């Protein structure tokens, strides 16, 4: 009896080894730039592995399912230094038979990387760039967008402000290009949902030290003066992606008004305070592995890697074209702890997703808001809809 039992164990080990030997390797690249952008708040400094940590967690999740399907997922990081060419880096990953690349790159670098590997069948997953043009006039057939767009973020915020009847906005815009792009999305959202921008002001970045010993005293004097003599408004909306001034606005405006946009009530794809729809277990797993909270970029990278894992499991394939065809099709969806399964817009390859509205400690609300209807999906009330798109996938 003992001999039979030992023999059975031996056969089991051999069978397991055979399965492992025959498993299909699915390599995923992670392409991003070195360094992190400093923030005004010391408690919000991004980690060196921001985004990458989310992708690593998703690889674990993919392999949990993959072991039953003879699929094994790996992640290969490629960190670009200043001056490194994103196109060459993407090509180098493709040379190593990596068919999927999660990219956290600026818009122009992302396009160069996508074009460099387009004819090789490599699919990029945009985890970081929120530029609408990447899904519109500059869209690519081999780029799937897990990150939301500026217009989706602006629409999610606008829906809540309108639902609250805070329809009169004072818009304060930074002087950098990305600030102007966010302001453009906010103007579009206001017009779309019935809000009115009663006044716009520009906050010029004059340079200088971002933190000084006299900072609190100086800012306490500057911000009330900057925001005084405004027409009647319900909420101050800030467009400051460069993070020059917006964090200084709450509690410092001349009139006692709430702040939203780049500070105060902030639209985002994920927040450390998200605890609904099973998110607590995700937050706890991430915290245990990384000794920090999960950011929006972490979640976007996690979602991108999970999209690959879901498509591989459903098609039982590792072929990039087969997975891309499935992702574009009507049967694809992915769960992401947001109350509903997420699907892909087939006209520009943007992932539909709810937008969280958070104040730094709690998730205040989740858009789309009640009453904002759509004939296909209420998620399509966020961002550019099919009739509006300029995308011609090529």
Regions found by a protein language model. Name each.
Residues 2-8, 19-394:
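Extracytosolic ligand-binding ectodomains
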């Amino acid at each position: 009896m003992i001999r039979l039992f030992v023999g059975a164990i031996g056969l089991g080990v051999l069978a397991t080894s055979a399965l492992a030997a025959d498993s299909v390797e699915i390599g995923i690249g992670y392409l991003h730039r070195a360094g992190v952008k400093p923030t005004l708040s010391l408690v919000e400094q991004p980690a060196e592995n921001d985004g990458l940590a989310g992708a690593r967690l998703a690889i674990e999740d993919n392999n949990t399912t993959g072991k039953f399907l003879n699929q094994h997922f790996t992640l290969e990081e490629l960190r670009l230094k200043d001056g490194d060419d994103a196109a060459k880096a993407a090509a180098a990953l493709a040379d190593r038979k990596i068919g999927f690349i999660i990219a956290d790159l600026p818009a122009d670098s992302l396009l160069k990387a996508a074009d460099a590997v387009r004819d090789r069948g490599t699919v990029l997953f945009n985890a970081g760039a929120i530029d609408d043009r990447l899904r519109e006039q500059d869209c690519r057939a081999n780029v799937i967008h897990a990150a939301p767009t500026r217009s989706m973020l602006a629409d999610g915020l606008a829906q809540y402000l309108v639902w609250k009847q805070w329809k009169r906005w004072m818009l304060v815009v930074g002087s950098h290009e990305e600030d102007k792009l966010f302001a453009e999305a906010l103007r579009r959202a206001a017009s779309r949902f019935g809000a009115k921008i009663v006044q716009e002001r520009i906050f010029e970045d004059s340079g200088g030290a971002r933190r000084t010993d006299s900072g609190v005293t100086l800012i306490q004097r500057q911000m009330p003066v900057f925001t005084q003599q405004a027409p009647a408004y319900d909420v101050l909306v800030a467009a400051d992606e460069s993070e020059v001034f917006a964090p200084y606005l709450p509690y410092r405006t001349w009139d006692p008004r709430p702040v939203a946009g780049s500070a105060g009530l902030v639209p985002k794809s994920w927040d450390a305070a998200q605890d609904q729809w099973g998110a607590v277990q995700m937050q706890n797993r991430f915290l245990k592995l990384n000794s920090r909270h999960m950011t929006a970029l972490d979640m976007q990278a996690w979602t991108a890697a999970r999209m690959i894992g879901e498509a591989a499991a459903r098609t039982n394939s590792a072929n990039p074209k087969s997975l891309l065809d499935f992702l574009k099709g009507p049967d694809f969806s992915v769960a992401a702890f947001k109350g509903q399964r997420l699907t892909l817009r087939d006209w520009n390859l943007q992932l539909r997703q709810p937008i969280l509205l958070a104040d730094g400690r709690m998730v205040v609300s989740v858009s789309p808001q009640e009453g904002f209807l759509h004939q296909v999906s209420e998620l399509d009330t966020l961002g550019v809809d099919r009739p509006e798109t300029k995308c011609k996938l090529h």
